[in-house]
Amino acid sequence: MKRREFITLLGGAAAWPIAARAQHANTPVLGFLGSASETRYEATRTAIGRGLNEAGFVEKRNLLIEYRWADFRYDRLPALAAELVARRVDIIFSTGSVVSALAAKAATTTVPIVFANGSDPVQHGLVASLNRPGGNITGISFINAQLVPKRLQLLKLLNPKTATIAVLVNPKNPNAADAKSFEAAGQALGVKIFIVNASTDAELSEAVQRGADALLVHVDALFNDRGEYQIADLAAEYRLPTMMANETFPGRGRLISYGADTRDLNRQAGVYIGRILRGEKPADLPVVQPSTFALRVNLKTAKALGLSIPEAFLLLADEVIE
């Protein structure tokens, strides 16, 4: 090979990584801020991916994603959010709890944020209003606190003899403040409500052994993810009818759930992320709320608990798992 050809070839090869870096620099980056652990977010990531695809984005093709996981340690979220901002991501998606959304909001007033959690975003100061969020943040609300009276009603219908219902909350989650309204809802049904706090595995075990007639698990990343199997196994051991918001709960051999389709709502969050990356402003995108809710019951689990499900309850169920 002639010297001139060799120099030309060498110069071209040296330019390849420069061109690749330039292309990489022009690719938008999504910061993914999760309250739980990576292994527990597969369904959420899949749903977000579907929404992003609808909006024209595919991870590693025309979108890069920086993942940060708090592993259920809420105190880590502020530092993780600040780290994403320092990495100069183009947008942040927060999921798992309102704590992650609050951490993201505290970390930046300029980087757009899309949240998805079960808390009231107005009550917790995330947005100015549902229709006009304002600022740099919008997202998806599963409105779980507003569903508590209905969930208590369903637990009472499940077993009309129910006199006491324990409500499990995580005191490290700001949505623990929702508990104040639960007692009034129980009083209207003639049911005594007592709040059980738990933020560790040991406390979860103690909570299930409190001697209530039924257990309602308030939304929290710890309960929905790592604690789900533990709670359900303890509920089976103590023959305690238990309700969660998570729609996959009965399908895993557990008893009942009542709530929104979180997979579809997370898909909508992905669409919002894509729209913002294409130039729309979070302040102009109303907070999405579910319009339909589903009741699911597992009859095999009911039999194992010694429960005979009333016909009136089964008529309300959207899905009955034999």
For each of these PLM feature ranges, what is it?
Residues M1-E322:
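Short hydrophobic alpha-helices and adjacent helix-cap/hinge residues
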